[in-house]
Amino acid sequence: MLRFRDRQETLSSFGDRDLVKCPHCGACAQVDLILSLQGVIKHNLTCQTCNISKEIGYFNYPSLWLQAPCCGNTLWAYNLKHLEFIEMFVKARLREYKSDPGETLGWSNRSLVLRLPQWLKSCRNYHKEEILNVIQSLRESSLHLDSCTLPQLAKIQLEVIAN
């Protein structure tokens, strides 16, 4: 049996480099979040297909590359690390949640696991295979990318438990 342990990761844990659709050529591009010395966050768009590199504003953010219709909803991920996180969560038959150690009242809903949509985290997920197939197709859509442009995949602990 596969086990997933909540490590209290937040959505911002995955948002330092996003895979997006290039607004100029439609190919897969990336947006890097850069924190300046003044504390200002900048978004730098880079596309290896059309060789564009420019700063973009928050409100001009291109659509995510890793998104597809799934189970009547949209499954999306910022990057492959985020996609792997979702995949490991969906695959797991045992999901362990823990409270935020800094939270005085116990549980906190800052954890990405607690903020996943209900259709994705349902324990009796009848659409598990469909979700995993969509994840696989999203992963394959980004296989052609240069490995130096992709974020390192997360080392999400998924354990095998003896029955």
Cite the ranges covered by each PLM segment:
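Long, charge-rich boundary regions
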Residues: 48-119
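Generic structural hydrophobic/aromatic packing signal, biased to beta-strands
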Residues: 20-25, 29, 47, 54, ...
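Generic recognition of cysteine residues
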Residues: 25-28, 50, 70-71, 123, ...
